[in-house]
């Protein structure tokens, strides 16, 4: 096993268009106004993404990211629970533009590795198509 595989990972994964079909804040507002606590029923899961998330090892950390307003926290958490989505944290109120992940390269010998380890990766997926990746 290479050193990178032995390290616990942190996954930053967007919600809308990646885990569930794309919705906008105004759509969620309307659902909350008309359906109250059942507003999450307007959401459509992308099954292969839910499956992917639930295959991530429990030792890894899953941070969901979203441009959803923080006022939609309860709605979003109910929806994720209803669909059985595994996560550790959610970051709300992010900008809808590009997201950058910047991290250092672990030098040889710092994690039992003989070579440097890259510690930042990114993957773009087609909107509403889900995550097609093996864990």
Would you name each region that the model predicts?
Residues 1-135:
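HAD-like aspartate-dependent phosphatase fold
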